[in-house]
Structures are given as structure tokens and as C-alpha cells.
Amino acid sequence: MKNEVILGSAYLAPVEYYTKLFAYPSVRVECYDHYMKQTYRNRCVIASADGPLALTIPTEKSDDLKCVMKDVRISDHGNWRHVHWNAFVAAYKHSPFFDYYADEFHRFFEQKYEFLFDFNLELCEWVCRQIDMEPRLIPTEEYMPEVECACLLYTSPSPRDMRRS
């Protein structure tokens, strides 16, 4: 397993996450770990004019106390797709190349995804293509405990300096 790493699913993960995607030819994306709120699984942090801004994708509550990541459903509560897209536009519309990427990026906020894992994986694959990276992203077939692998899960943003959306 020296040529691959296991990463957790993440919504527009921090740059450290992508350095692992760059460093390994094969990356397993853990989809059988237990979902935890307030992690990068459904939260990203962007640089806004007023400082770091946390954007959170709402999820549906599961009847099961320990829902696996692949089964977490996205909720349409709060019109989050519209709110997130407007936050990206407000933060980056004057950035170089925003117009070049905006149409393709916007499709992630127009399309309804049922599962958070699917949304995160497709978005990660798109980001990788934009920066000329082609890692092999492979969803895990069963839970892989951290002790069995060189596992790196960037799971939780720091609550400091964050505003909620």
C-alpha cells in the first residue's frame, strides 16, 4: 500500500488534501467511515472579503445513529446551493480566471445530488482536472481502519475565525 493513501471525502478540501492527491498515483476515498458533522465532509472554508467563511452543506438526519459516509443524503434545506454559489461569486468574481471556470463550477450548484459522497467525489475529480492532476480516486469497498494503512484524513476545520453560512 505504499503507492496509495486513504483520504476522507471532503467538500472542496484544503490544499493539504490536494498535495496528497498529487503525491500518490492511487488514492482510496473512504466511504464507509461514520459520518460526523462539522468536518470537511460537508464543510469548506473560502477566503471572503471579511475573512474566512465556512460554507456548510446541510445533510438529512439519519434514523441510524452511525450512518456511513456513502449513505449521507444532502438536504435541500435553506437553499444552500444558491447561497454557496453566491458566496463564491462574491468572493472570487474579480479574481483572474474566475470567468473561465465559473460555468463548469456553477453546474455543481445547479444539479441536485442525492448523496454527499457522490457530490464530493465529482467535485474533487473536477478540481483535479482543472489543475492537471489525474489521480486514480477509488472509493473503498469496506471500512479501512487507520491502523492498517498510511491514512490521512483531513476531517475537521478549525472553528476559529469562521463564520457560518
Locations of the language-model features?
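A basic- and aromatic-enriched beta-loop-alpha substructure that forms the phosphate/nucleotide-
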Residues: 39-110
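Hydrophobic, aromatic-enriched interface-forming segments
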Residues: 104-150
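A structural signal for well-ordered alpha-helical segments within the folded catalytic domains
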Residues: 15, 82, 86, 118-125
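Aromatic-rich, lipid-facing transmembrane alpha helices and their immediate juxtamembrane interface loops
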Residues: 3, 36-38, 44, 145
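Single conserved hydrophobic/aromatic residue that forms the stacking wall/gate
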Residues: 154-165
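A generic secondary-structure signal for well-formed alpha-helical elements
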Residues: 28-31, 92, 131
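Short, extreme N-terminal leader segments that mark the start of a protein/domain
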Residues: 1-36
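Short secondary-structure capping/junction motifs at helix and strand boundaries
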Residues: 95-100, 133-138, 164
